[in-house]
């Protein structure tokens, strides 16, 4: 996938009072290109999580169209979506979608067993780099939110993709951990030629973005 296009897209809930200055909603043809780094800056309630859910096909309560390389995503089959989510879009939701009863490592390996993208040694190095070496066997329910966020970042990096889509990926991280995460994601994105689309309401992932879009 090379391009995600939003055409006059708007959450249905905003239909009565559409935003006047959004650089995303109601744009006649907003192209998000592979290999480009985008920050989607938003206020709370502006629809950033909705945007991510729309792009990933988890919600359809919007007007307008979303296209993948010119194809309307509403025409995609379940099989298409399984392939896209496994090979083309790596998604980190704001709620992290971790399994609290499983260990940090098991949460990561659930993904990696589907993608076979990283070795156990590579995953162990990511745990070490992100200060989670001693949390390998810890149930996610026993971790702080910031630690859970780092586990979810490691899981995100366990697949090939053309687009990294991240909803407030560092909202509970300090600046040092933010920079470490940014370096890891940027390195992986450049290796794959992937785009980064990251949302924020005030604590953005510390990247050198190509474009900042106000939601």
How would you label these PLM feature ranges?
Residues 139-147:
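Conserved ABC ATPase signature
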Residues 164-168:
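Catalytic Walker B motif of ABC-type/P-loop ATPase nucleotide-binding domains
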Residues 56:
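Helix-to-loop junction immediately C-terminal to a conserved catalytic motif
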Residues 73-90:
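ABC ATPase NBD coupling module
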